[in-house]
Design a protein with these regions (language model features):
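Short extracytoplasmic
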Residues: 39-66
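Short hydrophobic beta-strand that contains or immediately precedes a catalytic carboxylate
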Residues: 53-57, 80, 329
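Secreted/periplasmic serine-hydrolase-like ester/acetyl group-modifying domain
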Residues: 125-258, 262-264
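Active-site segments of SGNH/GDSL-like serine hydrolases
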Residues: 258-285
Length: 349
């Protein structure tokens, strides 16, 4: 009997060690022991929050200061936005939130030309997460989360700190010139705009850009790429090179969501966060995205939706230093200001 117990303990020991490591280091804090703010913790904790106003969207809304939101609005909001969220996932989360909290009465849903792009496809994780919230074993056996665990462990062993939600930087004169010549936009903004072409234009539309923002910026800093020539190349691109089109299926779902919210006494706001002028001029105008998005806004308004548009028709005149990159506001220098603007507009009705 003792030998059997010893063998059993020996067999169970690796599983116990693995479970302990998983619980301690898995990056989504499924078990709530690490005090992290992740997509899964936000979804998991919403049902017990008793908060009737929610925010949804991708990273442009995921990092807003919730204490500033609540102070500005004079009521409490719960943030269900997360980095990399597709429009499909955000819409699905509205229905999830209504099931979790039947008293839900307000939804602030972020969207943009990027998430409305028909070629922007991500795996919809919401139904999977709903199942895994009820089944920890399914969560622990998920390949994607185990890969994330390995990455987190490797980072911990290397002493690499995690700075979740922090997107801020300071800029100097060198960021605006190359070889002593002034540039039309900040170097990193030019590099970032070139990367957006990977999602919005035909392959090889740009001959000077590299596949990633970091690689392009490194090429600019090493004088291997002329930032001015790259910007000019983007300006010369025509609509014929565009692969961008409206995701009509998700646009229809947005309209259906409007009808659902109206039928259930939920106030729905569609919010288009601001972007730097470099994205508008280098990406959207040459590829014809701007005109198509104006049509989208009109369709949403025609469905009696409340549209708060800071991307196109009501773009704030922020300095480029208030943007971390062309698409995301700096979490220190820009995002707080826009957060106040957004929720001041919301309480005005």
């Amino acid at each position: 009997m003792k030998k059997f117990i010893a063998k059993l303990l020996l067999a169970v020991l690796p599983i116990a060690i693995y479970a302990g490591i998983f619980v301690a280091f898995e990056p989504n804090d499924y078990f709530g022991l690490q005090g992290k703010d992740t997509m899964i913790t936000r979804v998991k904790q919403y049902g017990a929050s008793n908060i009737n106003s929610i925010i949804l969207g991708d990273s442009r809304l995921a990092h807003i200061d919730m204490s500033l939101v609540n102070t500005t609005a004079g009521r409490e909001y719960y943030n269900l936005a997360f980095g990399g969220a597709s429009l499909e996932e955000s819409i699905d989360l509205v229905y999830f939130a209504k099931k979790a909290n039947p008293k839900l009465n307000e939804v602030v849903l972020g969207l943009s030309f990027y998430t409305l792009n028909a070629s922007y496809n991500t795996q919809n994780r919401i139904s999977t997460i709903e199942k895994q919230l009820k089944n920890p074993i399914a969560y622990m056996s998920n390949l994607q989360y185990n890969t994330q665990l390995a990455t987190a462990l490797l980072g911990a062993l290397r002493g690499v700190p995690l700075q979740e939600g922090v997107e801020t930087s300071e800029h100097t004169k060198e960021d605006y010139e190359q070889n002593g010549e002034a540039l039309p936009y900040r170097k990193d903004l030019i590099a970032y705009a070139s990367v957006l072409y990977n999602k919005c234009a035909k392959p090889n539309t740009l001959t000077l850009a590299k596949p990633t923002q970091d690689a392009t910026l490194a090429g600019i800093n090493a004088n291997e790429i002329s930032a001015a020539q790259l910007a000019n190349e983007m300006l010369k691109v025509t609509k014929s090179s565009s692969l961008w089109s409206v995701n009509e299926q998700q646009l229809m779902r947005l309209c259906e969501l409007g009808d659902y919210c109206k039928a259930n006494d939920i106030k729905l706001y569609f919010v288009l966060p601001p972007m730097d002028i470099s994205v508008r001029e280098l990406v959207c105008a040459p590829l014809g995205i701007d005109k198509a998005m104006l049509d989208v806004i009109e369709k949403l308004k025609a469905n009696d939706a409340i549209v708060l548009d800071y991307e196109w028709t009501n773009a704030p005149s922020y300095k480029d230093t208030q943007y971390y990159d062309g698409f995301h506001l700096d979490t220190v220098h820009g995002l707080p200001q826009w957060t106040k603007t957004l929720f001041t507009d919301i309480i005005k009705g």
